[in-house]
């Protein structure tokens, strides 16, 4: 046990580094970092187990920061661990630095997740805890015996996702999940009492959490709480630490600056900064100095960790020798490579909903990808993720031998937890719901794109053909929204999300193949509720891989090209037949992914959709969904309003999504 005086000094060193980063950058959030320094110091110098030489070691404990604005606290602690240099943290918030304003995933430097909108970070942690339990059920406790730590703030607790995660983590009994709640009662514009008055401890106890309430600035109390949390066998643990915003801060006149809203989101500034550094024992002429005894504390912990990890590695090596097949499997799972899948035995039925085609694909994956977890937001029998569920069983408390995560009606938590499972490593995740409910998931989709986490989003009921449920459940603008993510590039220059909307069940197979092969970015798969007429016999479905391809009319001169995705392709095919009877030469193109199509050669793009061609686009979404493919000389028939409640066949007729109206629209276009 380390001396309390030393631990206080180490926390003060973290505070000095944090406020100095913010001061030098002229922006940032010092107050919360100052209040949380005691917890992060105890956790990082006494509890967190990792390999100083192998940052990606699968058996490491993982720490997920939810309030990313508290990055100075995290960067300071990681600097004491020698994962950042003083020069690194002096470049806080600057162009090209590895210390951005909010942390971005960087395993080599000890950062497990990008910290985005409040609430998501601790959901990643809960997902990681599920992944660890899932893998332990398959590999055993020698390889999987680590803890998942999360840090959440008042703002994160206020976010609705905290209730979703609280319920799910408690229901699953994730005793490997330990979360510190930094309760300082201050947020950016008010004290927390202005917006919250509930009993947070009681709330989490009701969700089956082990709740410990402590002084969050007392190192002895923090240590005791972490020891107790590590011993918990049946429940996740919430450590509620009452902390002091801006602990140790002084104003310009030397008076107390603690518990002030002003310290939350701006540099202390001028004499307040000088007085604070001095008050904490720092040298204002060298504020980035690390105290020698504090550095020794962390170096001693690193030496201790090398011994701990050496014993763990020896046990792992013995396990690998005794279990060569499992060891090879584990290496493959953590490699980040796409799994090997034999699709040859899958024969799709014709003229079925593409969601049913997806279900058949998921059945193949359930049999051949043993490290895959699929989830649904209480819709497995409708979004047809039950194609996977029917060949496994759900994860439950004390039984993680299954591979289906029942998320209940919690779309955002489901998405974030599935992302967290993949951030942990060793698993592949997919999750399903209705396309209209993707709106609940947008913050998670964006963060998955930013972190390049290759989760699979499965969205069924893709258009107004949801029918009788009416406009609240009929997606119109959603496809345009998600396809914007194909136009947004990630920092590796890739389309940030790969979006695929197949034309029929056989195309759905190829889209699932591509989704499973894509281990670099998220993939969105969009499927129909209703039956979809299969494409003509002889269609080369592997052309789906090019994002857009000719379905009919490839060998003739054409007067017009009809282009669509998903259900609308078969409508175009039928409309083309009517046009041909009238002497019009027609080419039909299926475009499941404009982003993928734009990644093809200019020659291929010109071959499929020549720029000077007359192109007619059909979309059940907003016209803008397909305008990029139609071009300046083209015409789009889409939906400019919300849908209506009626059988989908009636809606097709009323809204103009029939072969006859395609004929009418194209004839007018060519006139």
Where are the predicted features?
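Non-catalytic, alpha-helical, charged scaffold/linker segments
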Residues: 277-308
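Short, well-ordered alpha-helical microsegments
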Residues: 159, 222-223, 382-384, 414, ...
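Small/polar loops that bind or transfer phosphate-bearing groups
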Residues: 65-66, 153, 214, 241, ...
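Thiamine diphosphate
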Residues: 1-147, 162-289, 296, 302-526, 531-533, ...
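Short acidic, Gly/Ser-rich segments with clustered Asp/Glu that frequently serve as metal-coordination loops
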Residues: 155-161
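Residue-level marker for buried hydrophobic side chains located in beta-strands
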Residues: 150-151, 179, 375, 616
């Amino acid at each position: 046990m380390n001396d309390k005086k030393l631990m206080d000094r180490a926390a003060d060193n973290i505070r000095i580094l944090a406020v100095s980063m913010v001061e030098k950058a002229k922006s940032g959030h010092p107050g919360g970092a100052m209040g949380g320094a005691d917890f992060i110091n105890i956790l990082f110098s006494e509890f967190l187990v990792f390999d100083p030489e192998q940052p990606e070691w699968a058996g490491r404990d993982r720490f997920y920061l939810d309030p990313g604005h508290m990055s100075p606290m995290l960067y300071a602690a990681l600097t004491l661990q020698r994962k950042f240099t003083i020069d690194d943290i002096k470049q806080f918030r600057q162009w090209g630095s590895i210390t951005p304003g909010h942390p971005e995933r960087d395993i080599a430097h000890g950062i497990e997740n990008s910290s985005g909108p409040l609430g998501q970070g601790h959901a990643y942690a809960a997902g990681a805890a599920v992944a660890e339990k899932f893998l332990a059920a398959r590999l055993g406790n020698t390889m999987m015996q680590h803890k998942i730590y999360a840090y959440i703030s008042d703002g994160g607790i206020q976010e609705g996702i905290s209730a979703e995660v609280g319920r799910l983590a408690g229901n699953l009994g994730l005793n490997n999940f330990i979360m510190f709640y930094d309760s300082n009662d201050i947020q950016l514009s008010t004290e927390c009492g202005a917006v919250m008055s509930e009993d947070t401890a009681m709330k989490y106890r009701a969700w089956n959490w082990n709740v410990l309430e402590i002084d969050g600035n007392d190192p002895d109390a923090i240590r005791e709480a972490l020891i107790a949390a590590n011993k918990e066998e049946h429940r996740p643990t919430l450590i509620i630490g009452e902390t002091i915003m801006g602990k140790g801060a002084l104003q310009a006149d030397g008076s107390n600056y603690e518990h002030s809203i002003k310290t939350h989101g701006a540099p202390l500034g001028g004499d307040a900064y000088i007085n604070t550094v001095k008050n904490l024992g720092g040298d204002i002429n060298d504020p980035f100095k690390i105290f020698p005894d504090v550095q020794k504390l962390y170096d001693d912990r690193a030496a201790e960790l090398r011994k701990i990890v050496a014993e763990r590695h020896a046990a792992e090596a013995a396990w690998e020798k005794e279990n060569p097949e499992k060891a090879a499997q584990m290496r493959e799972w953590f490699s980040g490579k796409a799994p090997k899948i034999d699709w040859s035995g899958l024969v799709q039925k014709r003229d079925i909903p593409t969601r049913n085609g997806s279900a058949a694909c998921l059945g193949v994956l359930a049999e051949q990808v043993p490290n895959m977890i699929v989830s649904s937001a209480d819709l497995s029998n409708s979004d047809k993720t039950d194609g996977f569920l029917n060949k496994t069983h759900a994860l439950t408390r004390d039984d993680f031998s299954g591979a289906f995560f029942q998320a209940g009606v919690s779309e955002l938590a489901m998405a974030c937890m599935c992302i967290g499972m993949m951030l942990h490593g060793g698993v592949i995740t997919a999750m399903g719901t209705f396309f209209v409910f993707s709106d609940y998931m947008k913050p998670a989709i964006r963060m998955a794109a930013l972190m390049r986490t290759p989760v699979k989003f499965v969205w069924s009921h893709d258009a107004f053909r949801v029918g009788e449920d009416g406009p609240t459940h009929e997606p119109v603008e959603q496809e345009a929204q998600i396809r914007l993510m194909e136009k947004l590039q990630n920092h590796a220059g890739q389309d940030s999300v790969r979006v695929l909307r197949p034309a029929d069940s056989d195309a759905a197979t190829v889209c699932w193949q591509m989704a499973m092969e894509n281990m670099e970015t998220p993939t969105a798969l969009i499927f129909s509720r209703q039956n979809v007429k299969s494409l003509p016999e002889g269609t080369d479905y592997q052309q789906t891989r090019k994002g857009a391809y000719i379905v009919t009319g490839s060998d003739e001169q054409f007067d017009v090209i009809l282009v669509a995705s998903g259900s609308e392709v078969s409508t175009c095919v039928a409309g083309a037949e009517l046009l041909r009877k009238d002497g019009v030469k027609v080419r039909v193109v299926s475009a499941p992914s404009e982003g993928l199509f734009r990644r093809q050669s200019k020659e291929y793009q010109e071959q499929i959709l020549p720029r000077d061609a007359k192109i007619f686009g059909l979309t059940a979404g907003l016209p803008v969904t397909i305008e990029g493919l139609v071009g300046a000389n083209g015409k789009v028939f889409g939906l400019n309003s919300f849908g209506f409640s009626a059988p989908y066949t009636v809606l097709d007729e009323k809204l103009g999504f029939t072969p006859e109206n395609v004929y009418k629209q194209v004839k007018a276009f060519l006139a």
